[in-house]
């Protein structure tokens, strides 16, 4: 895939939150394509179980309902900042997301067994947070379908994170940080450069967290 093809096909995973609880804002995001792969119109929404089960379930229901009304093929990416994995897994099996993310701090043995506790159609993702050692990442990549990479761009490049993930049949996702979008509608030149440079590493999926869940211009993000 060439660089131009990669950017054209990139998916954006947008986090739902208070900003998108405004249904008009959510609809605007859907119609703009919060994660549009131009070849087949896929949209992906990240929902946090740790925001509360009732809240998460309502966000998922509304997202799916609005997507169905517009004949959009959508996906749910379920994540959590919580520590109760049993409750999280039970919720995941109930709502059946396309992807479920688990923090790397759960340990390798956890990742080796978690798929057996999930529905057959749920893909697993290892969440690699800022500051995580990259030494043993390959072992985790081997057990997962996706990896959420929240590392600095220099580490991503120097430690060949994208190549290592893909070599283990684990699709890497890049967390794009654009703090200026928490205040305005346009990201900074530095943020654009950082994201563009990192995408050249070979990411085909990009995630937005606070920018869409809590930012004043969620759809614009």
Which ranges hold each PLM region?
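Non-catalytic helical/linker scaffolds that mediate oligomerization, partner binding
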Residues: 1-221
């Amino acid at each position: 895939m060439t660089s131009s093809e990669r950017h054209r096909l990139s998916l954006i995973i947008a986090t739902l939150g208070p900003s998108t609880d405004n249904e008009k804002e959510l609809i605007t995001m859907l119609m703009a394509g919060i994660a549009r792969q131009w070849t087949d119109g896929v949209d992906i929404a990240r929902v946090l179980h740790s925001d509360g089960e009732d809240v998460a379930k309502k966000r998922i229901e509304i997202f799916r309902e609005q997507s169905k009304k517009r004949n959009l093929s959508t996906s749910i990416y379920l994540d959590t900042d919580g520590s109760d994995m049993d409750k999280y897994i039970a919720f995941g099996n109930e709502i059946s997301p396309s992807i479920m993310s688990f923090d790397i701090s759960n340990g390798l043995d956890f990742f080796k067994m978690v798929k057996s506790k999930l529905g057959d159609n749920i893909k697993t993702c290892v969440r690699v947070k800022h500051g995580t050692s990259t030494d043993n990442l390959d072992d985790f990549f081997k057990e997962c379908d996706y990896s959420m990479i929240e590392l600095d761009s220099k580490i991503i490049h120097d430690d060949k994170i994208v190549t290592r993930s893909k070599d283990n049949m684990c699709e890497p996702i890049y967390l794009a940080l654009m703090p200026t979008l928490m205040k305005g509608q346009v990201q900074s030149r530095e943020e654009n450069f950082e994201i563009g440079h990192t995408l050249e590493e070979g990411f085909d999926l990009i995630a937005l967290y606070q920018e869409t869940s809590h930012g004043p211009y969620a759809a614009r993000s």
